[in-house]
A protein has these predicted regions:
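Short beta->alpha transition motifs characteristic of CBS
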Residues: 52, 59, 123, 135-139, ...
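Catalytic metal-binding/acid-base residues of hydrolase active sites
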Residues: 16, 50, 109-110, 175, ...
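N-terminal glycine-/serine-/threonine-rich phosphate-binding loop
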Residues: 1-43
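Active-site catalytic loop in hydrolytic enzyme cores
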Residues: 3, 84-91, 95-101, 110-189, ...
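Cys-nucleophile CN-hydrolase/nitrilase-fold catalytic domain and related Cys-dependent amidase chemistry
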Residues: 22, 34-127, 197-199, 203-213
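Short beta-strand scaffold segments in enzyme catalytic cores
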Residues: 106-107, 121-124, 157, 219, ...
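Structural detector of well-ordered beta-strand residues that form the stable sheet scaffold
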Residues: 105, 167, 216-218
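C-terminal beta-strand edge segments of enzyme domains
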Residues: 222-346
Length: 346
C-alpha cells in the first residue's frame, strides 16, 4: 500500500432529489456539492440514483405477461430524465466538482448511448472536474429489473487518490461476496456504499464490510417523502399506498474496525461531515488483510472479467488481420515468412 495522506474530510449528502426532474435535481446537486466544498469537504458522496430519482414503489404498469399503457407513459418520463454519459448534464456536475475542488461520487440513472436501456450507475469526478469512473450496477434487485439493465462493462473501477483507492458498489451489490472481494483486490481504502435501502439489517452489512475489508465504509442514503412524487403521474395509485417517508436516511460512516465514526442520521436532509484518519487503514490490517497476508491465492482465486463480450466481438470482427490473399508482391508483409504463413505468393 502506498503512503496515504493523513486525513480525508468527507461529506455525505443525505437528501432527496426533485423527483423525475433531471435538470432541477442536477441544479440541486451542484449547490450541495459547492456547499460541501466550501465547508472543506475533499470527498463528497451522494446516494444511489440521486438523479433523477430512485423510483421507489413503482412498477411502471408491468405485471407478468402484461404492460399498462399509462405506466409506459410514466416510464418514458423517467427515461427522458435519465442522464447520458458523457453529456452537458455530466459537464454541469463536473464543473461543480471543480468549483468545490473535491472528488464527487454521485448515483444516477444512466441512459445508454448505444441503446434504449437504462442503468443504475455511479459516477466519480475528480477535483479538476474530470470524470474518473463509471460503474453500472451489476444486477438490479427484484423489480428494479423492470427499469434497469444489468451492468455490462467497467464493473469495478477504482480511483487513485491521495487517501488510497476509492471504489463503489451500489446498494445490494454489497451483498455479493465476490463483488466485495473484487474491490478489496483493487486495494480500496475508502469503500463507497450508496443506496436507497433503510432496512435494519443493512447496518449489519456495512459494519461487516468495514471489518472484512479493513477500510472506511461510506453509507449514504436518500431521504424523501411520498409527497415528493410528481402530481401529474399517470399511475398515482402505485405510490399512494407507500409509507409517508419511503426512504428515511440512516447515512453513516463506519471505521476500519466496524465502529460508527458518525452515527446514523434519520428522517431529515443533512450534509454529514467526517474526518477520516487514513492511518487507521494500514494499522487495522495488522492481523487481517483480506487480499494480503490473510489470503490463500494458491487455494482460492477470484477471476474478474471486466471485458464487455459484445464490444469484444465487434472489435474482433472489425480488426484488420491482413489475412487476405494477394497477387504479386504483398505490401503488408515485411518478411517472407509472414507471406508464406498467409498463403501469399508475393
Amino acid at each position: 500500500m502506498k503512503d496515504l495522506k493523513d486525513t480525508c474530510r468527507i461529506a455525505l449528502i443525505q437528501a432527496g432529489p426533485v423527483m423525475f426532474d433531471k435538470d432541477a435535481t442536477i441544479e440541486k446537486a451542484c449547490k450541495e456539492i459547492i456547499e460541501a466544498g466550501n465547508n472543506g469537504a475533499e470527498l463528497i458522496v451522494f446516494p444511489e440514483s440521486y438523479i433523477p430519482c430512485y423510483p421507489f414503489g413503482l412498477t411502471f404498469g408491468f405485471t407478468v405477461g402484461n404492460r399498462d399503457k399509462y405506466g409506459r407513459l410514466d416510464w418514458k418520463v423517467y427515461y427522458d430524465n435519465s442522464v447520458v454519459v458523457p453529456s452537458e448534464d455530466t459537464d454541469r456536475l463536473a464543473d461543480a466538482a471543480a468549483q468545490a475542488g473535491a472528488y464527487v461520487s454521485i448515483g444516477i440513472t444512466e441512459r445508454a448511448l448505444e441503446n434504449a436501456t437504462l442503468y443504475c450507475t455511479n459516477l466519480i469526478f475528480g477535483p479538476d472536474g474530470a470524470l474518473l469512473a463509471r460503474h453500472r450496477k451489476l444486477k438490479p434487485t427484484g423489480a428494479e429489473r423492470l427499469c434497469w439493465g444489468d451492468g455490462n462493462k467497467g464493473e469495478f473501477p477504482v480511483v487513485d487518490t491521495p487517501w488510497g483507492n476509492i471504489g463503489a458498489l451500489i446498494c445490494w451489490e454489497n451483498y455479493m461476496p465476490l463483488a466485495r472481494v473484487a474491490l478489496y483486490e483493487k486495494g480500496v481504502t475508502i469503500y463507497l456504499a450508496p443506496n436507497t435501502n433503510n432496512n435494519a439489517e443493512w447496518h449489519d452489512t456495512i459494519k461487516h464490510i468495514a471489518i472484512e475489508g479493513h477500510c472506511y465504509v461510506i453509507h449514504v442514503n436518500q431521504n424523501f417523502h411520498k409527497d415528493d412524487y410528481p402530481k401529474n403521474f399517470h399511475c398515482p395509485h402505485e405510490y399512494e399506498n407507500l409509507p409517508e417517508r419511503p426512504c428515511n436516511g440512516g447515512s453513516a460512516v463506519i471505521d476500519p474496525y466496524g465502529h460508527y465514526l458518525t452515527k446514523p442520521v434519520w428522517d431529515k436532509d443533512k450534509i454529514i461531515y467526517a474526518d477520516l484518519d487514513m492511518q487507521q487503514v494500514p494499522a487495522s490490517r495488522m492481523e487481517f488483510d483480506a487480499t494480503g497476508h490473510y489470503s490463500r491465492p494458491d487455494v482460492l482465486e477470484l477471476v474478474i472479467n471486466e471485458h464487455d463480450p459484445v464490444e469484444d466481438l465487434i472489435e474482433f470482427a472489425e480488426y484488420d488481420y491482413g489475412l487476405e490473399e494477394c497477387d504479386g508482391i504483398c505490401e503488408s508483409c515485411e518478411e517472407a515468412a509472414e507471406c508464406e504463413a498467409y498463403n501469399c505468393e508475393g
